[in-house]
Amino acid sequence: SPSIFSTITSTGGGGGGGAGATNARSGGSGGGAAGGIPCGGTVGAGNTPSVSPPQGSPGGQGAGTAPAGGGGGAIDPGSAGAPGTAGAGGDGATNNIDGSSTDRAGGGSGSNGTGTGNGSNPFGGGGTGSGVPGTAGTTNKGGGGGGAYTPYNGGAGGSGIVIIRYKFQ
């Protein structure tokens, strides 16, 4: 879900694809598409709604015979799933606007259907994929949710965050 302050909106990450939603959800960082028969849906688009500078990248593609694709991150898109290998989530971005170095908006990994997602990407709050339902992205970090292999559901995207910094005189 997005976080809004006045006219500033920080879009949350997109959810990963899965049996309950073959097509991944779009967001600041797009979700990765599901893998496994009969899935292989469409990826989530990044930077949705479109703003400049962009808030994220698209997810990676899954396929009917391959594991799920990874979710897009702030910096890079998610990678596609391949036989035996889940797609990695795209890299998030680091900033220190709140006084400490924090990673945000990483893409969630895909699932290989038999265990943990090979492409786990904790960088920036992306959810990990697994042989069970995908994990949600971290709250207030805008990470994409982990993708899932049929018959499980993908994880929800993490909510965005708006941080206001000003100098008091």
Predicted regions and their residues:
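Low-complexity, glycine/proline-biased repetitive segments and flexible coils/loops
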Residues: S1-Q169
